[in-house]
């Protein structure tokens, strides 16, 4: 019925947030707990989850979500959780707690062993989906600030499920030739919507390049193109901006996003606001990068603030016309090696709502000047 149905604006997407209880503001949006709970409650056939790691039992709300998944699996709903091979620390405990859930570890880069599964998304029944920066952990559900998108528009959910099929093909328990055969089968039908064919003003972008498949857009290409074409404003809320790629313990300069930000400020006079995280998960280069941007653009309209509470929100807004929500840092290692899916939209309402979130965070008491 999809070809004959009108496409709703924004593909029925709603913003989803986790806000820690110690923050001085609340959200008007769906919470991550409510989003995951709704996906589980409405599921009839399957729930597929992709996350670097799986540690929902670390908080009370995370444990409640896992218990609901357990109940769903006991009713015959097919549940598959994809984890990165290096994020399976709690796997034994979870399997013993719920043997009906199928946990699959993946290795998206067996050849070089440097790529990780970073993607954070849920898909159910080809009808509902979540994509954002909330991994399947108790912290992301309850105690760490995150941002994502929920949609119950079937065509969008189906398109995201194709990404799940791609990552699932890299099951670390399979032989390499089986992985290649599986990937060859799923990649040719890898997406229906992209930057040149969004649905309701929405499309996904992907990384890394060797997992793109037919018609998919490389995330770094879209992000850099948007930064380089910015005319009036760039708002960035990220855990880290790191202009390096790490391989085998060595660091290599990767200035693509970093340079695009500087060029926008200096060459075109674009107003830029950068809100970075400052907690123990930060790359050591992150604060140095923020300070260098602040120093290089001291004569330009570029401002940098630091968010003092655990913040895993990864948000980009360009010219108040485009929004990008992802699970990856603006980090060369993430963009060159890791597997993830990002949400993109040019829908005016979604961009406006995301902008309000950025403005709220920017002026909050938790945002401090880099110079303090």
From Swiss-Prot:
SMART domains: PLDc. PROSITE patterns: PLD. A lipid is attached at residues 185-186 (S-palmitoyl cysteine). InterPro entries: Diverse_PLD-related, PLDc_3, PLipase_D/transphosphatidylase. Keywords: Host endoplasmic reticulum, Host Golgi apparatus, Host membrane, Host-virus interaction, Hydrolase, Late protein, Lipoprotein, Membrane, Palmitate, Viral budding, Viral budding via the host ESCRT complexes, Viral envelope protein, Viral release from host cell, Virion. One of its GO terms (cellular component) is host cell endoplasmic reticulum membrane. It comes from the Viruses. It is a lipid-anchor. A motif (YPPL) lies at residues 153-156. Residues 307-334 form the PLD phosphodiesterase domain. GO terms for biological process: viral budding via host ESCRT complex. GO terms for molecular function: phospholipase D activity. The keyword Nuclease does not apply. Palmitoylated. Attachment of the palmitate moiety is essential for correct intracellular targeting and protein function. Its EC number is 3.1.1.-, 3.1.4.4. SUPFAM superfamilies: Phospholipase D/nuclease. It catalyses: a 1,2-diacyl-sn-glycero-3-phosphocholine + H2O = a 1,2-diacyl-sn-glycero-3-phosphate + choline + H(+). Late-budding domains (L domains) are short sequence motifs essential for viral particle budding. They recruit proteins of the host ESCRT machinery (Endosomal Sorting Complex Required for Transport) or ESCRT-associated proteins. F13 contains one L domain: a YPPL motif, which might interact with PDCD6IP/AIP1. Belongs to the orthopoxvirus OPG057 family. Major envelope protein that plays a role in the biogenesis of the viral double membrane and in egress of virus from the host cell. Produces the wrapped form of virus that is required for cell-to-cell spread. Acts as a lipase with broad specificity including phospholipase C, phospholipase A, and triacylglycerol lipase activities. Interacts with protein OPG190. This is Envelope phospholipase OPG057. It comes from Vaccinia virus (strain Copenhagen).
């Amino acid at each position: 019925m999809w070809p004959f149905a009108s496409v709703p604006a924004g593909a029925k997407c709603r913003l989803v947030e986790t806000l820690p209880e110690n923050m001085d503001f609340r959200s008007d949006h769906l919470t991550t707990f409510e989003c995951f709970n709704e996906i589980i409650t409405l599921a009839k056939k399957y729930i597929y989850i992709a996350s670097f790691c799986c540690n929902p039992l670390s908080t009370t709300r995370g444990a409640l979500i896992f218990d609901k998944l357990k109940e769903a699996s006991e009713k015959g709903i097919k549940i598959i959780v994809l984890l990165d091979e290096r994020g399976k620390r709690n796997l034994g405990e979870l399997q013993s707690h719920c043997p009906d859930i199928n946990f699959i570890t993946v290795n998206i880069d067996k050849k070089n062993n440097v790529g990780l599964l970073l993607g954070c998304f849920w898909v159910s029944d080809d009808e509902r989906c979540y994509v954002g920066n909330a991994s399947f952990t108790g912290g992301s559900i309850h105690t760490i600030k995150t941002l994502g998108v929920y949609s119950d528009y079937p065509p969008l959910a189906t398109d995201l499920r194709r990404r799940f099929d791609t990552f699932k093909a890299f099951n670390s328990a399979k032989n390499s030739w089986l992985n290649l055969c599986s990937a060859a089968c799923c990649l040719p039908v890898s997406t229906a919507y992209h930057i040149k064919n969004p649905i309701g003003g929405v499309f996904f972008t992907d990384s890394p390049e060797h997992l793109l498949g037919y018609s998919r857009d490389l995330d770094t290409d879209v992000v850099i193109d948007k930064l380089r074409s910015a005319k009036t404003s760039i708002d960035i809320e990220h855990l880290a901006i790191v202009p390096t790629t790490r391989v085998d313990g060595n660091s290599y300069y990767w200035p693509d996003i970093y340079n695009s930000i500087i060029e926008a400020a200096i060459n075109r006079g674009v107003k830029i606001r950068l809100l970075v995280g400052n907690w123990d998960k930060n790359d050591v280069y992150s604060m140095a990068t923020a300070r260098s941007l602040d120093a290089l653009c001291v004569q330009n309209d570029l401002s940098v603030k630091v968010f003092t509470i655990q913040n895993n929100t990864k948000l980009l807004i360009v010219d108040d016309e485009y929004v990008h929500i992802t699970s990856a840092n603006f980090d060369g290692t993430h963009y060159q090696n890791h597997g993830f899916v990002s949400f993109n939209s040019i829908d005016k309402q979604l961009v406006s709502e995301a902008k309000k979130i950025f403005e709220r965070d920017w002026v909050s008491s938790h945002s401090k000047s880099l110079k303090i």
